[in-house]
Amino acid sequence: MGHGAVQGKVDLGNTPVGPRAAGRPSAFAFRLLSPTALLFSYLLLGALLALALLQRATPAVARAQLAEFPKELGAFHMIQESEIAPNILAILQPTDTVVRAYARQPGEPLVSLYIAYHADQSEGSRVHSPKSCLPGAGWQITTIKTIPLAWKGGESKGNLVRVEKGLDKQLALYWIHSNGRVVANEYVARAYIFHDLFARRRSDGGLVRFMTVFAPEEREESAKERLLVLAEATLQVISRYIPD
C-alpha cells in the first residue's frame, strides 16, 4: 500500500456491499484521496518529471575556450601557464580548464588562477569544492570566511581561505560560477543546478580560484588585496568563458 494510505484494518462492517453500494465510492476510497495521498502523488509525479529532464541532453551553450582567456588582466600579466596532470583530470572531469600564474609588479608574490568549466553537471562531471581538494593536496585549512565581491552592479560572496603546508602559507579566494551567479555556498550552487535544469535546461557552471603565497612578514590584508584586484579583473570577462 502506498505511503498515503491510512495504515490499519478496514472495517468491513461499515463498508457498503451489494448492488446498492456499486454506484458510490466506499469510505475507504475517500481515505485514499486524503491530502497526504495527493501530496505523495504530486511528489512522485515531480520525481518522474525530474528524472525525465535529467535524462535529456542539455543543449550546448556558446562560449569562448579558456585557452583564449586574457593574458593581461588589469595591472596583472601572465608569466606562466601549466597543464593539469591526466590522473587529476580523470577525477575532476572538467570540460575546459586554464591554470596560470599572473604577476603585477617585480618582487611581489605571484597569483595563480585556476578556472574549470563543466558543460553538463547533471551526471558525473561536477564542480569540486576546494574545501575538499585543498586538504587532498596536503593543505591544511586554518581559516575560511566569506567576503563580498562586486558583481553586475550588486554584491555577491566569495570564499577567502587561509591554508598551510609545513612552512608554506597561502591565501586562496574562490567561488562557484553558476549561470551568471557568483556563489560561495556549495549547497546553494547545487540547488541552482536543479533549478536551471528545469527552468533553462542548463546544468553548466564552473569554479574560479585564486591563490597567492604570503611574502615574509606580509599581513593577510595585503595578500587579500592582491587576490581581489585580480578577481575583479577576472569578473569583467568571465561570462565569455562561463556563460550567464
Model region roles, listed by residue range:
Residues 1-35:
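Intrinsic disorder/low-complexity segments
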Residues 4, 56-57:
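Membrane-interface elements of multi-pass transporters and channels
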Residues 18-21, 27, 72, 132, ...:
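Intrinsically disordered, low-complexity segments enriched in proline/serine/threonine
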Residues 35-48, 54-55, 146-244:
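A short, solvent-exposed beta-edge/loop patch
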Residues 57-73:
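Alpha-helical transmembrane signal-anchor/signal-peptide segments
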Residues 72, 98, 109, 204-206:
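Envelope-exposed proteins and targeting segments
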Residues 79-196:
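Short, solvent-exposed recognition patches
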